[in-house]
Swiss-Prot record:
The gene is rpoC. Keywords: DNA-directed RNA polymerase, Magnesium, Metal-binding, Nucleotidyltransferase, Transcription, Transferase, Zinc. Pfam families: RNA_pol_Rpb1_1, RNA_pol_Rpb1_2, RNA_pol_Rpb1_3, RNA_pol_Rpb1_4, RNA_pol_Rpb1_5. This is DNA-directed RNA polymerase subunit beta'. It is an enzyme of class 2 (transferase). DNA-dependent RNA polymerase catalyzes the transcription of DNA into RNA using the four ribonucleoside triphosphates as substrates. It comes from the Bacteria. One of its GO terms (biological process) is DNA-templated transcription. The RNAP catalytic core consists of 2 alpha, 1 beta, 1 beta' and 1 omega subunit. When a sigma factor is associated with the core the holoenzyme is formed, which can initiate transcription. One of its GO terms (molecular function) is magnesium ion binding.
Length: 1377
């Protein structure tokens, strides 16, 4: 017999009535279950032994045959076959239905599948099936139409009128006849013609009908099979009946549901034999339909069937659905034996690969192994005696347990397991007590602490499982974080503090300035107390004296040999950098040795130095009062401006918040400065924060500075700050304000955890079948990577972006012409350094986004596996790693939606512009006007600048060795100075000779400016670093006059488009344009010159505050109106988790911007239906219409030239628009940048390739826009590879290929549309997925991980891949010659 598990694909179809009868071992005729006296199954009942098999092993029902030797004999008295009782798990029965019944999945679920085939609505279908209306099947030669519905009266009338010349009927029989009469081929071609004729080709109903018809044709299912004549009865062991204490029975709900069906079926059969009146028969048929519906899906009905305890009964569908359903409860997650759990405590004495296991627990877990050893050692001779010995806990048992445990790994898991490092293997060490001991350095990977956390222990039993634990899961093999390649095993808290203390330098202590020949002398001096740990000394290293401290010598002495001398104060970051460096240079074995040394040293010296905190360590700066007084003065001035009406209420609020944030920042800086100087840097609070052991600048600020501004529950900032700190104590009002944020914090955390968990689940589902399957897909496409900058600050270097990837193109040294990097070569750290040295700033690399492997990805496109720092192996489940890498930090992301000017940005809003580097202004772009003392930008603008890296006066140069504008790299001779020495370049850039200066400058860069910015420099100016070059209003966006003249209002009508508000606080009148949209009114301001001509026009958006009067004279640069930033309250910046969710689900943002579809000239048209029409005239003179909601702030004006993809009004970008206008590559870049932005702001580092894997899955499908000669349907969404494959076949046969456009689908939808129906069904909407899959006769190729777990195969990754399955091991012994 072929091994049952040895199959490669699985198919799902609709079972035909014959198929169901084939499966069956007999018909269930009675609704009885078991006899209440004998407790044996009733004959022909739901548990009948004749049908389902015997309940007693190798014995028939009546007891005539009792032995295994009669196997297979059918008893002549009771007709029961002599078999094993386990057949009751697999033998099915059936019920012959007295009337056909429709299957609820195919008629009730929306869209109704039967309804689509017959083209009738769901309600009409229901009325036919529930015997309310007749349907005309054959109209004959009458006036009736086929499929026409008739109620009782109409039917009687038609019969009287036409007699028997037409055929009409009701119930499932009628539907069955209609389905049998369908000609699918004819219907398909008819619908295809209809689709071509219809101009609106994307008629969804037509598309759905065509898809269903094609699916029926391909799968070989017959439509009439959706109507059932025979009902299968599942095996009795799957719907068991068990006796409880007290003689009562507990039974599966399915038995009750089956009994209702059998009772009604039998009753109907009797009524049909008796020729009962039609109305009674019809009612019984309807009840039969209802009972079968309840059996298949009880929860989907309006009136659910309830059991004795008035709870809804669980039907077959309910058993599959949801978290408690078969898929998620029993198939994807199972409870495991040989496991235990206990509280964890710290085990500082353990080695990195060890964990402490309580002896009692170990004895229980390893019991079978101990029993086997006891019997082998002949201490006992049977299992029962061995168990007794174990219970008595005699000495031999402990000795044997020690032997058993040696080199038998165990797995430790801490819930929640957010990434693969949540389960690791350790070698157990027996410990007393009942708590598991955990190594302190692995806490970070588990996110564990010792405040009562519990962990589970699992014992891998088979040799293969043990080998896998040793080779792959041992804690020492998991030193790096798979998300980014940074070490995940590193010291924190006490250890960091101990090492920080040890390696710090202190002035004026014992032994300062002494010289030592070697390390041993230093340690002797310390032991003799003639040298302080923190004393600055000189030690001979590699033949020369080096200045260091005694503590650093101790640290370096303890490190493994070969690691270069570490001569700095070690904070947590420094330690992580050190671990990283040692890993790269010396490999993991040295790192493991070093980590245990670091742990040991850290704990020892933290104990030795024993730092404590007292109130006197918390130093409140004396300047605090001055700062607060100054802030109050500034606020008084702001209030005064507000009272005069110079600024609006929102500007006032924003300014006040800004003042307090600045004050708080200044005070914090001062406080940290004071703490740093206190006790020469040995202030304990400062040390804890500076070393990164515990606490942060923010927390110290609350202790010794001021608590600062608090946020309300809504996320708004309360403008009244808490000026006190915890040392001074809070006043009553301050305490009350500070309670505001606390509750929100707790609620957020609870919601966030569930949200992040769900995000991970969706990501795992979409990416679970992405496995590295081949070595090289042979693509020639790649993506461009360059350094990510914010202004001048480098956020992510080229190294972080490209290291570990493969290059697409060959790169040569621009000067020597030699090949630095070949095509398809891995970009190592050394290569990147070389590239940076020769000035390469952009690279095209292979990426998962452009991989062309048919399934999964290829090795070359994926690049490096970060958890091992080596190229990825074939068989690595990179999809799941990607999902975990993105989901795991999800719990750290905030939930709060920030307001503009709220905590999110207020810190950075400054009203002055200055740049860090010196630069030369090359040019200006954007609309600007000249005013008295500078240039005023009336709209957004750009400065074209070149940064100056190096400058020298030409008079100090003897001979210049380079040309003007020449590109130079590091190490190139630039000039010979007056002293005759050759000066080499230490920068990459361009030479610029100007006036009497020699500069090295960068490539031209752009700096964006806001509207209303006043620039105080001119083109061509050389500007020193840090100099203020311009000012702007951070809290309002002005609309500025670009010409001189008189103001003329158009459609600005008081009470309609203009609202005058009298400010109750100040008594000033504020004029505001309303948000209301009127068809005919378009509020604008014209500027008229002296001759009465209109020279400029300005559209006024909703919520703009007017600053001018009608008829008033105006000069260039005057403000006409301003938009307060506060009025952008509605546009909350969705931060953190909700933003990531929106991006992965590709939701259309609320406050949407309109992007220019083409490049061209803007033309303003009228307002239609509340939307402003803007045309863009492209280079061919074609107009492209854009509709923008009136009242939105426009970013373009009439006559402007725009590029495709430019924003026409403010708002958020819709990712679908990016795909449509700018294409797939731009969309990938957009999504990648947006998602990374959220994580980067939270300080989380995730490599691009992980996000790339998910985006690749989201863009897997294409939409058919032209069918050609293929079998596709217009508007159908198909997999890219299916599309290419079909086209290839059509082209080979000389046909016309189909055309498709790329589409973007959110993660939930993608998971449901995945090729594997098992995976999709186990994700969400189980019944819907199975319904569609059965109609299409889908085949699951079992490629992904989930589907293999469900059916009980090994997952197809690593050694479970088909690649390795077929390997045969054979011994090849050479015979001696």
């Amino acid at each position: 017999m072929k091994e049952i598990k040895d199959f490669e694909r699985i198919k799902i179809k609709i079972a035909s009535p014959d198929q169901i009868r084939n499966w069956s071992y007999g018909e269930v005729k009675k609704s009885e279950t078991i006899n209440y006296r004998t407790l044996r199954p009733e004959k022909d009942g739901l548990f009948c032994e004749r049908i389902f098999g015997t309940t007693k092993e190798w014995e028939c029902y009546c007891g005539k045959f009792k032995s295994v030797r009669y196997k297979g004999i059918i008893c002549d008295r009771c007709n029961v076959e002599v078999t094993h009782f386990k057949v009751r798990r697999e033998r099915m029965g059936h019920i012959e239905l007295a009337a056909p019944v429709a299957h609820i999945w195919y008629y009730k679920y929306i869209p109704s599948r039967i309804g689509l085939l017959l083209d009738i609505t769901a309600s009409s279908l229901n009325s036919i099936l529930y015997y309310e209306k007749y349907v005309v099947i054959e109209p004959g030669d009458t006036d009736l139409k086929k499929m026409q519905l008739l109620n009782e009266d109409e039917y009687i009338e038609a019969r009287e009128r036409y007699g028997m010349s037409f055929n009409a009927s009701m119930g499932a029989e009628a539907i069955k006849t209609l389905l049998e009469n369908l000609d699918l081929d004819e219907l398909s071609s008819k619908l295809r013609i209809q689709m071509i004729d219809k101009d609106d080709k994307t008629d969804k109903k037509l598309l759905r009908r065509l898809e269903i018809i094609e699916n029926f044709k391909i799968s070989g299912n017959k439509p009439e099979w959706m109507i059932m004549e025979v009902l299968p009865v599942i095996p009795p062991e799957i719907r068991p009946m068990v006796q409880l204490d007290g003689g009562r029975f507990a039974t599966s709900d399915l038995n009750d549901l089956y009994r209702r069906v059998i009772n009604r079926n039998n009753r109907l059969r009797k009524l049909l034999l008796l020729n009962a009146p039609e109305i009674i028969v019809r009612n019984e048929k309807r009840m039969l339909q209802e009972s079968v519906d309840s059996l298949f899906d009880n929860s989907h009905k309006r009136k659910v069937v309830k059991g004795s305890s008035s709870r809804p009964l669980k039907s077959l569908s309910d058993a599959l659905k949801g978290k408690q359903g078969r898929f998620r409860q029993n198939l994807l997650g199972k409870r495991v034996d040989y496991s235990g759990r206990s509280v964890i405590v710290v085990g500082p004495e353990l080695k990195l690969h060890q964990c402490g296991l309580p002896a009692k627990m170990a004895l229980e877990l390893f019991k079978p192994f101990v029993i086997r050893r006891l019997i082998e050692s002949e201490a006992v001779f049977n299992i029962k005696r061995a168990k007794n010995l174990i219970e008595q806990e005699v000495d031999e048992v402990w000795q044997i347990l020690d032997l058993v445990i040696k080199e038998h790994p165990i797995l430790l898991n801490r819930a929640p397991t957010l990434h693969r490092l949540g389960i690791q293997a350790f070698e157990p060490v027996l410990v007393e007590g009942k708590a598991i001991k955990l190594h302190p350095l692995v806490c970070h990977a588990y996110n564990a602490d010792f405040d009562g956390d519990q962990m589970a222990v699992h014992v891998p039993l088979t040799p293969a499982a043990q080998a896998e634990s040793w080779a792959l899961m041992l804690s020492t093999n998991n030193l790096l974080n798979p998300a980014n390649g940074h070490p995940i095993v590193f010291p924190s808290q006490d250890i960091v503090l101990g090492l920080y203390y040890l390696t710090m330098e202190k002035k004026n202590v014992v032994g300062e300035g002494k010289k030592f020949l070697n390390f041993n002398n230093v340690i002797l001096a310390i032991n003799n107390r003639s040298l302080d740990y923190n004393a600055s000394i000189y030690v001979k290293i590699h033949g020369e004296y080096k200045k260091t401290t005694a503590g650093r010598v101790i640290f370096n002495e303890a490190l493994p040999k070969g690691i270069e001398f570490v001569n700095k104060t070690l904070s947590d970051l420094e330690l992580q950098i050190l671990i990283s460096k040692v890993y790269v240079v010396h490999g993991s074995s040295i790192v493991i040795e070093m980590l245990d040394i670091i742990k040991e040293l850290g704990f020892r010296y933290a104990t030795k130095f024993g730092c404590t905190i007292s109130m006197s360590d918390i130093i409140v700066p004396d300047e605090k009062r001055t700062y607060v007084e100054r802030a109050n003065k500034e606020i008084a001035k702001i209030q005064n401006d507000y009272a005069k009406g110079v600024i609006t209420g929102e500007e006032r609020y924003n300014n006040v918040v800004s003042v307090w944030l600045k004050t708080n920042e200044e005070l914090t800086n001062k406080m940290m400065e004071i703490l740093k100087k206190d006790r020469d840097g040995f202030n304990v609070i400062y040390m804890m924060a500076d070393s990164g052991a515990r606490g942060s600048r923010n927390q110290i600020r609350q202790l010794a500075g001021m608590r600062g501004l608090m946020a309300k529950t809504s996320g708004d900032i309360i403008e009244l700050p808490i000026i006190s700190n915890f040392k001074e104590g809070l006043s009553v009002i301050e305490f009350f304000i500070s309670t505001n944020g606390a509750r929100k914090g707790l609620a957020d955390t609870a919601l966030k955890t569930a949200d992040a968990g769900y995000l991970t689940r969706r990501l795992v589902d979409i990416a679970q079948d992405v496995v590295v399957r081949i070595e090289d897909c042979g693509t020639i496409n790649g993506i461009k990577v360059e350094t990510v900058k914010n202004g001048e600050e480098i956020l992510e270097s080229l190294k972080e972006k490209a290291v570990g990837s493969y290059s697409i193109e060959r790169i040569k040294n621009p000067i020597t012409g030699e090949i630095v990097l070949d095509a398809n070569e891995e970009i190592s750290e050394a290569k990147i350094e070389l590239l940076e040295k020769i000035g390469i700033e952009k690279l095209v690399i292979r990426s998962v986004l452009t991989c062309e492997a048919e399934h999964g990805v290829c090795q070359k496109c994926y690049g490096r596996d970060f958890s091992k720092n080596k190229p990825v192996n074939i068989g690595e489940a990179v999809g799941i790693i990607a999902a975990q890498s993105i989901g795991q930090p999800g719990t750290q992301l905030t939930m709060r939606t920030f307001h503009i000017g709220g905590v999110a940005q207020a810190g950075s809003e400054d009203d002055k512009i200055s740049l860090k580097n010196a630069f030369i202004l090359n040019g200006i772009e954007g609309f600007n006007v000249r005013v008295d003392n500078g240039i005023l930008f009336t709209r957004k603008g750009t400065l074209k600048i070149i940064n100056v890296f190096y400058e020298e006066k030409i008079k100090n140069i003897k001979e210049i060795k380079v040309l003007d504008s020449q590109r130079v790299i590091k190490g190139i001779p630039l000039f010979i100075d007056k002293k005759g020495s050759e000066i080499l370049s230490s920068y990459i850039g361009y030479v610029k000779l100007r006036d009497d200066n020699f500069f090295i400058v960068s490539e031209e860069q752009e700096v964006s400016l806001k509207a209303g910015t006043k620039l105080e420099i001119e083109v061509g100016d050389y500007v020193e670093s840090g100099k203020v070059i311009g000012t702007f209003d951070p809290f309002a966006e002005p609309i500025i006059a670009e010409v001189k003249g008189k103001i003329k209002f158009k459609d600005i009508i008081l009470g309609t488009t203009l609202k005058e508000e009298i400010n109750t606080e100040t008594g000033n009148v504020e004029k505001r344009i309303t948000d209301n949209v009127f068809e005919s009114l378009d509020p604008r301001i014209f500027i008229i010159d002296s001759s009465g001509m209109e020279v400029a026009s300005y559209v006024l958006p909703g919520d703009a505050y007017l600053q001018v009067e009608d008829g008033q004279s105006i000069n260039i640069g005057d403000i006409i109106a301003k938009l307060s930033k506060g009025s952008e309250k509605t546009q909350d910046i969705t931060g953190g988790l909700p933003r990531v969710n929106d991006l992965f689900e590709t939701r259309i943002p609320k406050n949407l911007t309109e992007m220019a579809k083409v490049s061209g000239i803007v033309q303003f048209k009228s307002i239609q239906k509340g939307k402003r029409l803007i045309n863009i005239l492209d280079e061919y003179g074609v107009e492209h219409k854009h509709y923008i909601p009136a009242g939105k702030h426009l970013l373009v004006r009439d006559g402007d030239v725009v590029k495709a993809g430019d924003m026409l009004c403010d708002g958020r970008i819709n990712p679908h628009d990016v795909l449509e206008i700018l294409g797939g590559i731009s969309l990938q870049e957009f999504l990648l940048a947006e998602i990374q932005d959220v994580y980067r702001k939270q300080g989380v580092s995730i490599n691009d390739k992980h996000i790339g894997v998910i985006i690749k899955q989201m863009m897997k499908k294409v939409k058919i826009v032209a069918v050609g000669d293929t079998n596709f349907v217009y508007g159908q969404k198909v997999d890219k590879h299916t599309f290419y494959e079909q086209n290839r076949k059509v082209i080979e046969q000389g046909g016309e290929p189909a055309i498709a456009s790329p589409i973007l689908i959110g993660v939930t939808k993608t998971s449901l549309n995945i090729d594997s129906f098992i995976s999709a069904a186990s994700f969400q909407e189980t019944t819907k997925v199975l319904t569609d899959a059965s109609i299409a006769g889908k085949i699951d190729d079992l490629r992904g991980l989930k589907e293999n777990v469900v059916i009980g195969h090994l997952i197809p990754t690593g050694t479970g891949m088909g690649l390795y399955k077929k390997i045969k091991v054979s011994e090849n012994i050479d015979s001696e010659v």
